[in-house]
Amino acid sequence: ILSFVFACLLALSAVSAAPEPRWKVFKKIEKMGRNIRDGIVKAGPAIEVLGSAKALGK
């Protein structure tokens, strides 16, 4: 499920917005998607550490 969401965010961020003012909403959505994608990328190592710690605890 996460990989599907990540692929959608990549596709959303790859769309280039036109310089017209009515595309401002799409630029905001693109920026939000970029922030979410960056957050997922930064959280990856922490999730791996938690998973390995949980495995060691068993």
From Swiss-Prot:
What this protein is reported to do is described as: Cecropins have lytic and antibacterial activity against several Gram-positive and Gram-negative bacteria.
UniProt xrefs under PROSITE patterns: CECROPIN (PS00268)
**Subcellular localization(s) per the UniProt record:** Secreted
Arranged from A to Z, the UniProt key words for this protein are: Antibiotic, Antimicrobial, Immunity, Innate immunity, Secreted, Signal
Source lineage:
Eukaryota, Metazoa, Ecdysozoa, Arthropoda, Hexapoda
Q: Report the protein name in the record.
A: Cecropin-B
The answer to keyword Signal applying to this record is: yes
Superkingdom in the source lineage: Eukaryota
Q: What gene is it encoded by?
A: CECB
Induction info reads:
Induced as part of the humoral response to a bacterial invasion. Transcripts appear within the immunized fat body.
Q: Which N-terminal residues, if any, form the signal peptide?
A: 1-21
- How is this protein annotated for GO cellular component? extracellular region
* Family that this chain belongs to: Belongs to the cecropin family.
Query: Which BP terms in the Gene Ontology apply to this protein?
Result: antibacterial humoral response; defense response to Gram-positive bacterium; innate immune response
Q: What is its main location?
A: secreted
> InterPro entries attached here?
Cecropin
